[in-house]
């Protein structure tokens, strides 16, 4: 029996809605990254984008365990000499774009390259409870019910 390899034309993508309120950031990101890659499917093929489309709402209400809320630092470089910048998770979550914490956590769990960039385009993250994908009728995934540790204490 030959190994099954899915073709891009055979891929069936579902829409999944996840409410991130009260969920632990790393656990949420792991579940979403696996969904985006398609690793939850029996038809997973490493070189084909066969993951689902994921919509995350309430990304600003995600929970970081321990002292990560104040101590976790995000670094980036402007490209200019001496251009290293940093922000704490607290500054980002209380800033203009709190959904970036969730986006970066997921992005850094997806392999880098053309396929990873294509898979990241299947992710939509919203800071509030409203989203623009009602027309796709996303199926709700209760991440908190998958494992009791997925729900944060804060």
Swiss-Prot record:
Top-level taxonomic group: Bacteria
One GO BP annotation is: translation
The parts of the chain that form a coiled coil are none
An example Gene Ontology molecular-function term? mRNA binding
What Gene Ontology terms describe where this protein resides (cellular component)?
Answer: cytosolic large ribosomal subunit
* Keywords carried by this UniProt record: Ribonucleoprotein, Ribosomal protein
Biological role = This protein is one of the early assembly proteins of the 50S ribosomal subunit, although it is not seen to bind rRNA by itself. It is important during the early stages of 50S assembly.
Name of the featured protein: Large ribosomal subunit protein uL13
Source organism phylogeny = Bacteria, Pseudomonadati, Pseudomonadota, Alphaproteobacteria, Hyphomicrobiales
């Amino acid at each position: 029996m030959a190994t099954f390899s899915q073709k891009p034309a055979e891929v069936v993508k579902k829409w999944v809605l996840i409410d991130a309120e009260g969920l632990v950031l790393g656990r949420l990101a792991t579940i979403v990254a696996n969904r985006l890659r398609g690793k939850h499917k029996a038809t997973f093929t490493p070189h084909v984008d066969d993951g689902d489309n994921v919509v995350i709402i309430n990304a600003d209400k995600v929970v970081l365990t321990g002292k990560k809320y104040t101590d976790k630092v995000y670094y980036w470089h402007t490209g200019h000499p001496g251009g290293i910048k940093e922000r704490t998770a607290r500054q980002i979550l209380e800033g203009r774009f709190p959904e970036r914490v969730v986006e970066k956590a997921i992005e850094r769990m997806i392999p880098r390259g053309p396929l990873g960039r294509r898979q990241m385009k299947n992710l939509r993250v919203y800071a509030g409870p409203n989203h623009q994908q009602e027309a796709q009728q996303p199926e709700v995934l209760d991440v908190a019910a998958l494992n009791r540790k997925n729900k944060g204490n804060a």
